Amino acid sequence: MSTKIITQGGHEALKKELDYLWREHRPDITQKVAWAASLGDRSENADYQYNKKLLREIDRRVRYLRKRLEDMRVVQYSPEQEGRVFFGAWVEIENEAGDLKKFRVVGYDEIYGRNDYISIDSPMARALLKKEVGDEVLVNTPEGEKLWFVNSIVYER
């Protein structure tokens, strides 16, 4: 089960998506379904079948977003977090080969479509929690344990 926390920006993005789906996208698709249904035989009507399927997907996403937004807690930045990795931190790490990775530790619902976000529930984020700049971090991966060094920690305020 995913942790039910989210950043303020993530919360606003989900609310914006919900608003778009409910107020703009769904009415548009509903209108298309009604138009396609008016053409007659629905069993061989590709427009009707496609848009009806799309309407079900929109409704499923709307239900999911409403439930998640109701259940989630927005985590605000606190000055006490400074200097350590906690939820919402931008972290830069480096391995022994000199490979760099930079990402933000966020909630599960915020990671999709973003290569620079990782879930607080991921093994990397769990290993990094409470670490400071200069600390070594041992992360369990499918290929075995990997060693990383924390280069920087920054918070958006």
Swiss-Prot record:
Q: Where is the signal peptide?
A: none
Family affiliation: Belongs to the GreA/GreB family. GreB subfamily.
- Could you provide one GO biological process annotation from this protein's UniProt record? DNA-templated transcription elongation
Pfam families, alphabetically? GreA_GreB (PF01272), GreA_GreB_N (PF03449)
Q: What is this protein called?
A: Transcription elongation factor GreB
The record's annotation in NCBIfam families points to: greB, PRK01885.1
User: Which HAMAP family does the annotation name?
Assistant: GreA_GreB, GreB
Keyword hit for Coiled coil: yes
* InterPro entries membership: GreA/GreB_C_sf, TF_GreA/GreB_CS, Tscrpt_elong_fac_GreA/B, Tscrpt_elong_fac_GreA/B_C, Tscrpt_elong_fac_GreA/B_fam, Tscrpt_elong_fac_GreA/B_N, Tscrpt_elong_fac_GreA/B_N_sf, Tscrpt_elong_fac_GreB
Please explain the role this protein plays, according to its UniProt record.
Answer: Necessary for efficient RNA polymerase transcription elongation past template-encoded arresting sites. The arresting sites in DNA have the property of trapping a certain fraction of elongating RNA polymerases that pass through, resulting in locked ternary complexes. Cleavage of the nascent transcript by cleavage factors such as GreA or GreB allows the resumption of elongation from the new 3'terminus. GreB releases sequences of up to 9 nucleotides in length.
- Give the UniProt keywords, A-Z: Coiled coil, DNA-binding, Transcription, Transcription regulation
Q: Which GO terms describe its molecular function?
A: DNA binding; RNA polymerase binding
Gene3D superfamilies in the record: Transcription elongation factor, GreA/GreB, C-terminal domain, Transcription elongation factor, GreA/GreB, N-terminal domain
Q: Record keywords: Metal-binding included?
A: no
Which chain positions lie within coiled-coil regions?
52-73
Entry-linked PROSITE patterns: GREAB_1, GREAB_2
